[in-house]
């Protein structure tokens, strides 16, 4: 697998609550890669929580910071990177993401809702109609998420280990070994 990937980063994309930050370290371990949570890097770099950044900078300001951090992170190799759910919204981010292998973790809204119903740390979810907000965000982002190299549909009851193993199994389908002449 390592020879097939040749150090190329893996970027996990998808809605908040799909398990990118949980699956990412497992995937990294399988590959002998490092793991980065982009939101964690942003929080550390700015010394502010994501909620604080949204409150102080607005979504547009946060998205700019996110792009700046992504541009720096993509210079490294052998990383599995969990991105924020909105990383796909800015065209410039796709230029960075395409330096690696993009994996979309696709989880049904019902399951995301159950995972996030009690979560007060997500700035885009401070909405009375949480399920409606999730549906709306997913509808808006699905055409963008679908540009990923790999589309992993997560089923109810699948463990993070199951998901990581499925990703490992399908990576060879999108990466062809370099032909030796």
Swiss-Prot record:
Binds 1 Mg(2+) ion per subunit. It comes from the Bacteria. The lineage of its organism: Bacteria, Bacillati, Cyanobacteriota, Cyanophyceae, Nostocales. SUPFAM superfamilies: P-loop containing nucleoside triphosphate hydrolases. Belongs to the shikimate kinase family. Its cofactor is Mg(2+). Catalyzes the specific phosphorylation of the 3-hydroxyl group of shikimic acid using ATP as a cosubstrate. Pathway: Metabolic intermediate biosynthesis; chorismate biosynthesis; chorismate from D-erythrose 4-phosphate and phosphoenolpyruvate: step 5/7. Gene3D superfamilies: P-loop containing nucleotide triphosphate hydrolases. Keywords: Amino-acid biosynthesis, Aromatic amino acid biosynthesis, ATP-binding, Cytoplasm, Kinase, Magnesium, Metal-binding, Nucleotide-binding, Transferase. It catalyses: shikimate + ATP = 3-phosphoshikimate + ADP + H(+). InterPro entries: P-loop_NTPase (IPR027417), Shikimate/glucono_kinase (IPR031322), Shikimate_kinase/TSH1 (IPR000623). ATP binds at residues 17-22, 122. It is found in: Cytoplasm. GO terms for cellular component: cytosol. Its EC number is 2.7.1.71. It comes from Nostoc punctiforme (strain ATCC 29133 / PCC 73102). GO terms for molecular function: ATP binding; magnesium ion binding; shikimate kinase activity. Substrate binds at residues 39, 63, 85, 141. One of its GO terms (biological process) is chorismate biosynthetic process. Its main location: cytoplasm. Monomer. This is Shikimate kinase. Signal peptide: none annotated. Mg(2+) binds at residue 21.
